[in-house]
Curated annotation (Swiss-Prot):
Protein name: F-box/kelch-repeat protein SKIP6
Keyword Repeat carried by entry: yes
Domain (F-box) ranges: 19-66
Subunit note: Part of a SCF (SKP1-cullin-F-box) protein ligase complex. Interacts with SKP1A/ASK1.
Cited PANTHER family: F-BOX/KELCH-REPEAT PROTEIN SKIP4 (PTHR24414), F-BOX_KELCH-REPEAT PROTEIN SKIP6 (PTHR24414:SF23)
Gene that produces this protein: SKIP6
InterPro entries in the record: F-box/kelch-repeat_ARATH, F-box_dom, Kelch-typ_b-propeller, Kelch_1
Length: 372
């Protein structure tokens, strides 16, 4: 006999949760959906109520990693007047009706502390760490993290001292931050360099080099061969965590490194004083011009680079508008780079074009690629 309620009515039937894809098990359906390129997620969320929350599901991204369907997505910070802090964007790839690809920078939520200037940036898997920076010329010890899966921000433990224009790099699950503070007291002296353990979420001081090499501001940083390179206007430093050893950078590297750079297959790429892209091989200790990209403009200023899945992505500021135009174009190019023989590095431009238009006097702060 069927159970009844105290009033004699039949109990309401419990509805089973809707299936993602009818006739498929949840595991199989999730495995299929995880392979859909991320640029289609906004459309995917419109398919049904069941799909609506799918793009914000941690299980979906865990499945993407499990089935090898992750993508390298470009994120860009741009300072746009009158804002003093950075506005954040991500590069969106769209396929148009005529089967051509369209690339554009689309806005995402900016850091809750938007007025930070001179922060250091590192990527750890699907997260971007924004480290320090100054607020009204006062160095901050704050650390913000952008979760690139969901475009949400959170704070983690503060550094031991405030910093601006520091260098940072990630090695073996630890973030090393160097410089960016004046060594004018005991606390700043022992914390001129410090390390953040991602697993324990704690900061520890790193034994610093001598006073003569402890610069305040760093203009560039990178990780090569298990070492963090921190470059200043003079007296750059190199730290090797495994040996806990400090050393000076090779002179040829120091003289040739200009602006934002990135490392691909252990070659450091940046642009030189003539605006040409060059690559530095730390084993051979030599700079070589990147050939095959002569159609790109000369990057005299306002350019930055990122390693996006093994491709060299270059972002630069186009010419500012003149006359009645008060707008400036942001350009992007993606280059397939690699060695040719023993003495040459070549690049093939896979695409290049305008990805955003911004007011004059805007400036690219940084670009990074995260895995999602």
């Amino acid at each position: 006999m069927a159970a009844t309620t105290s009033s004699g009515d039949e109990p309401p039937e419990t509805k089973s949760p809707a299936q993602l894809i009818p006739l498929l098990s949840e595991d199989v359906a999730l495995s299929c959906l995880a392979r859909v390129p991320r640029c289609h997620y906004p459309i995917l969320s419109l398919v049904s109520k069941t799909f609506r929350s799918l793009p914000t599901s941690p299980l979906l991204y865990a499945t993407r990693a499990l089935v090898g369907a992750t993508e390298n997505i470009l994120y860009v910070a741009i300072r746009i007047p009158p804002e003093s802090g950075a506005c954040w964007f991500t590069l969106l790839h769209r396929t148009l009706s005529n089967s051509t690809n369209s690339k554009m920078l689309v806005p995402i939520p900016s850091c809750p502390s938007p007025s930070l200037v001179g922060s250091a940036y590192v990527v750890v898997d699907s997260e971007i760490y924004v480290i320090g920076g100054s607020i009204r010329d006062v160095p901050s010890s704050s650390v913000w993290v952008l979760d690139c899966r969901f475009h949400t921000w959170r704070r983690v433990s503060n550094m031991r001292v405030g910093r601006e224009f520091a260098a940072a790099g990630v090695i073996d699950g630890k973030i090393y931050v160097i410089g960016g503070c004046v060594v004018d007291n005991w606390a700043r002296s022992i914390n001129w360099a410090e390390m953040f353990d991602i697993k324990t979420q704690t900061w520890e001081p790193v034994a610093s080099p001598g006073m003569e090499v402890r610069e305040k501001w760093m203009h560039a940083s990178a990780v090569m061969e298990g070492k963090v390179y921190a470059m200043a206007d003079r007296n750059g430093v190199v730290y090797e965590p495994k040996e806990k050893k400090w050393e000076m950078p090779e002179k040829r590297l120091d003289l040739g490194w200009r602006g934002r750079a990135c490392v691909i297959e252990n070659i450091l790429y940046c642009y030189d004083y003539l605006g040409k892209i060059r690559g530095y091989d730390p084993k051979e200790r030599i700079w070589r011009e990147l050939k095959g990209v002569e159609s790109l403009p000369k990057f005299l200023c306002g350019a930055t680079m990122a390693n996006r899945g093994g491709k060299l992505t270059v972002l630069w500021e186009g010419k500012a508008g003149s006359g009645g135009s008060r707008r400036m174009e942001i350009w992007c190019a993606e280059i397939d780079v690699g060695r040719r023989g023993e003495r040459e590095i070549w690049g093939k431009i896979e695409w290049s074009g305008t990805v955003l238009t911004v007011p004059n006097e805007s400036a690219i702060v940084n670009c990074l690629a995260a895995t999602v």
